[in-house]
């Protein structure tokens, strides 16, 4: 697929048809969805038969990538399979590529550490002053470095508040209100301008090198320059959109942690494609993938500019081993169970060549 990047409009909307389909899934009952056969689930044999094996990620590559995040992880036991669907051969799917212990480490780095960096903008920054935790170098002795400035250092009923920039418009928010429902995203590296849909020209904050090392080992064709970490609670959604603000067509990486999410994706030209123009083995107009904790997708080729969104997060699907996070090793006990009701999605891209 050849794409003229200058012709892509970040403000363009999906077709009315795609929006209507997305909306129907967002409103559908979870149990009904799980039974009606609409979901493309690689763990269901009848659905898995529609997918094609694209290759594997060698176990040695995975082990090398995990080592960037810390020591002590078990070596990857086997190569990780990669799949695609004929509708979108450039949408590469990596089921269960991130083991649970590595998932926990990623959560700690992204939420304890990176969320606590003032240069990393969040959806809260527009209207609120964030109560960052300031600690002296001697504080937190014996505590992991990634945890020392975590917002979870405040208890859920802490008197600390997110103070509004304009008290006439917004009310102060408690730590529990923000961490449970009001925090929706944080950006790493390049800080995207959501109003103008562009990346600023000034030098961005440094992308976390350990996370970058992991990603670039497993997905070597994409340099990790910018990311958005999405915080979903069941009931939250992401509208259909295309990622077209980058000045390169390098692939997008997406990692899922926590509750399962339904990921809807459709070719960018699907509304213009007649049935005769579609590949003979493709009857679908879109995919509705069930992405589980530890799954990754890599959007390249024609899928790089495909319409995609998240119509539903499936309540009650967080792996049991993650449910209690961030409570572990005697820390953050008052927040035990926070992750049980969350889906964290790390979306990574290269801004420029």
Curated annotation (Swiss-Prot):
A molecular-function term among this protein's GO annotations: dioxygenase activity
Keywords on record: Cytoplasm, Dioxygenase, DNA damage, DNA repair, Iron, Metal-binding, Oxidoreductase, Virulence
Recorded superkingdom: Eukaryota
Entries under Gene3D superfamilies matching the protein: Alpha-ketoglutarate-dependent dioxygenase AlkB-like (2.60.120.590)
Enzyme class: oxidoreductase
Subcellular compartments: Cytoplasm, P-body
Documented EC number(s): 1.14.11.53
Domain Fe2OG dioxygenase positions: 223-352
GO process terms (BP): DNA repair
Cofactor-binding details, from the entry: Binds 1 Fe(2+) ion per subunit.
Function according to Swiss-Prot or TrEMBL: RNA demethylase that regulates the stability of mRNAs through an m(6)A-dependent manner. M6A is a modification present at internal sites of mRNAs and some non-coding RNAs and plays a role in mRNA stability and processing. Plays a role in pathogenicity towards plant host.
Gene Ontology CC entries for this record: cytosol; nucleus; P-body
Reactions accelerated catalytically: an N(6)-methyladenosine in mRNA + 2-oxoglutarate + O2 = an adenosine in mRNA + formaldehyde + succinate + CO2
Family: Belongs to the alkB family.
Cofactor requirements of the protein: Fe(2+)
Lineage: Eukaryota, Fungi, Dikarya, Ascomycota, Pezizomycotina
Binding site for 2-oxoglutarate: 343
Null allele phenotype: Does not seem to affect growth nor conidiation. Displays milder disease lesions on rice leaves.
Keyword Transferase: no
Organism: Pyricularia oryzae (strain 70-15 / ATCC MYA-4617 / FGSC 8958) (Rice blast fungus)
Residues at which Fe cation binds: 241, 243, 308
Protein name: N6-methyladenosine RNA demethylase ALKB1
């Amino acid at each position: 697929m050849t794409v003229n990047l200058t012709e892509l409009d970040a403000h363009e909307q999906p077709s009315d048809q795609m929006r209507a389909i997305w909306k129907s899934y967002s409103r559908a009952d979870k149990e009904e969805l799980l039974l009606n056969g609409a979901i493309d689930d690689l763990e269901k044999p009848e659905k898995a038969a529609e997918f094609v094996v694209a290759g594997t990620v060698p176990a040695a590559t995975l082990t090398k990538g995990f080592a960037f995040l810390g020591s002590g992880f078990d070596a990857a036991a086997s190569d990780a399979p990669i799949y695609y669907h004929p509708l979108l051969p450039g949408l590469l799917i990596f089921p269960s590529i991130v083991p649970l212990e590595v998932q926990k480490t990623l959560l700690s780095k992204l939420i304890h550490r990176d969320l606590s960096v003032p240069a990393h903008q969040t959806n809260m920054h527009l209207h609120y002053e964030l109560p960052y935790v300031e600690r002296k170098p001697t504080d937190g002795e014996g505590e992991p470095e990634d945890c020392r400035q975590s917002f979870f250092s405040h208890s859920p009923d802490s008197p600390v508040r997110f103070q509004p920039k304009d008290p006439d418009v917004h009310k102060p928010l408690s730590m529990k209100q923000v961490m449970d429902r009001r925090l929706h995203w944080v950006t790493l590296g390049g800080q995207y301008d959501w109003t103008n849909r562009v990346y600023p020209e000034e030098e961005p904050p440094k992308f976390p090198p350990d996370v970058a090392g992991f990603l670039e080992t497993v997905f070597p064709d994409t340099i990790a320059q910018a990311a958005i970490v999405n915080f979903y609670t069941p009931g939250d959604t992401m509208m259909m959109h295309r990622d077209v603000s980058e000045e390169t067509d390098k692939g997008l990486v997406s990692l899922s942690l926590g509750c399962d999410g339904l990921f809807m994706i459709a070719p960018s030209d699907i509304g213009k494609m007649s049935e005769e123009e579609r590949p003979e083995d493709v009857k679908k107009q879109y995919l509705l993938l069930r992405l589980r904790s530890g799954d990754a997708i890599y959007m390249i080729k024609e899928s790089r500019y495909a319409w995609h969104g998240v119509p539903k997060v499936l309540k009650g699907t967080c792996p049991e081993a993650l449910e209690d996070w961030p409570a572990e090793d005697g820390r953050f006990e008052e927040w035990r169970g926070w992750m049980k009701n969350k889906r964290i999605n790390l979306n990574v891209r290269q801004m420029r060549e």
